[in-house]
A protein has these predicted regions:
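Alpha-helical solenoid repeat scaffolds of the TPR/TPR-like class and their adjacent stem/linker regions
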Residues: 1-413
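Basic, alpha-helical interaction scaffolds
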Residues: 414-418
Length: 418
């Protein structure tokens, strides 16, 4: 057990002895916060560990929770799990600890254990805001597991408790679309059909309606709610001038076995390297997939943005001297539109991931064709359209094609029409 930690206002002597019994939880929390602010997370953890072992027992579960939070932030997940388990062992109704324990299980690839913790929060009559949190976690993870009816039911319960949750409305609507649950905009609780309609995501709206006004409304609402307004000057203006090849940067979280990742490898490979330098800026989870290896090899430079905040990501793009930044994500799942709001490149373009307007103020151009953005729809597009001939969508011609299945392998008769 680490040495007791003295509670000193300046945190300058974190090892002087003091009787744990004399310390209140408030004392410990305040000192731990000072240690964290000083960059000494290890001492803050040791402080909690000492107080949990030898301090008064009344609020020990809270100290275990705080310790678990620190350990989780340091990615010491096994120790964080032990701390949260101790917290709920000491106080079984401690909803905060169960919520965090569920997140740890999810991160560890144990979805059923995560779901069990969040259901336990609901079974123990937690405060309403924590029940909402638990229902939302259940809905999100159940959707990820493709258990769509259960996911929809969970989000419905959340919205019955609080109908003023735009992101939850968005997912609820999309879940009904996935299940072909008609009508999609079925009122319930305090939510009207119109509120469900206006809460629809852009991608869901593009499949629900061909009305360009509704599509632009969905995109604009997302931007207003989710993308920060930045007053600072565009980042690219602060970069020194440079010469040489044009630097094109591709921005995406889908450079793997994803629809976009399957389409673009040959696009990257066929850039004229005498004229262009090709950069990738991605937050794709790293793996040894052959598809991801090929995508990496097709880029001259790859900058990983996973775990990097949006402002820092934009600075990395600006410092790379990117001339044209091509966003392959749009407003689809996993998008990071705030990066574009910083204006890291003098020209920013939307392409491929979203076949329509993004309404993002940092995007200048939309690469499209006569079908994605016909001239009569331009008034409903915030970007200026550049129409490619024939079809806007690239497709990798080198992609391996699976063998055509035989009728017999599908259990079909040879001499019958199906």
């Amino acid at each position: 057990m680490p040495s007791p930690v003295a509670l000193r206002p300046d945190a300058s002597n974190p090892t002087a002895p003091q009787a744990w019994a004399e310390l209140t939880l408030t004392d410990v929390v305040n000192q731990a916060q000072r240690l964290q602010q000083a960059g000494d997370d290890a001492a803050a953890m040791a402080l909690y560990q000492g107080w949990i072992a030898d301090g008064p027992p009344a609020l020990r579960h809270v100290a275990c929770f705080n310790l678990g939070t620190l350990l989780g932030a340091a990615h010491r997940d096994a120790e964080a799990e032990a701390a949260y388990r101790r917290a709920v062992e000491l106080q079984p109704d401690f909803a905060h600890a169960r919520l965090n324990l569920g997140h740890l299980f999810e991160r560890a690839g144990q979805p059923e254990s995560a779901l069990a913790q969040w259901r336990e929060v609901l079974a123990r009559s937690a405060p309403v805001e924590l029940r909402i949190h638990a229902w939302n976690n259940l809905g999100r993870l159940l959707e990820k597991l493709r258990r769509y009816p259960d996911a929809e039911a969970a989000l419905r319960e959340s919205l019955l408790l609080d109908p003023r949750q735009p992101s939850v409305i968005q997912h609820h609507v999309h879940l009904r679309q996935k299940q072909c649950a008609w009508p999609v905009y079925q009122p319930f609780g305090e939510l009207t059909a119109n509120q469900l309609l206006t809460g629809t995501s852009l991608l869901a709206m593009m499949s629900a309606s061909d009305d360009p006004t509704l599509q632009l409304l969905a995109a604009t609402r997302f931007v207003q709610e989710r993308v920060p307004r930045l007053a600072a000057a565009p980042l690219h203006r602060g970069m020194p001038p440079r010469s040489g090849r044009i630097r094109i940067g591709y921005l995406s979280g889908d450079l793997h076995l994803h629809a976009v990742g399957l389409l673009v490898p040959e696009l990257f490979e066929l850039h004229d390297r005498e004229k262009f330098e090709v950069w990738g800026f991605c937050w794709t989870p790293e793996s040894a997939q052959p598809q991801q290896r090929r995508l990496r090899a097709a880029l001259d430079h790859l900058v990983r943005l996973a775990g990097v905040d949006d402002g820092t990501a934009a600075r990395l793009i600006a410092e790379a001297g990117i001339d044209v930044l091509v966003d392959l994500q749009g407003l689809t799942a996993g998008a990071r539109p705030a990066i574009l709001a910083h204006r890291a490149a003098p020209v920013q373009v939307s392409y491929l991931g979203l076949p329509g307007t993004s309404a993002l103020p940092g995007v200048d151009w939309l690469l499209a064709d006569a079908y994605v953005m016909p001239p009569e729809l331009e008034p409903f597009c915030t970007e200026r359209a550049i129409r490619l001939p024939h079809c806007y969508q690239v497709s990798d011609r080198q992609r391996e094609v699976a063998l055509t299945p035989s009728r017999a392998s599908c259990g079909l008769p040879v001499d019958r029409f199906v």
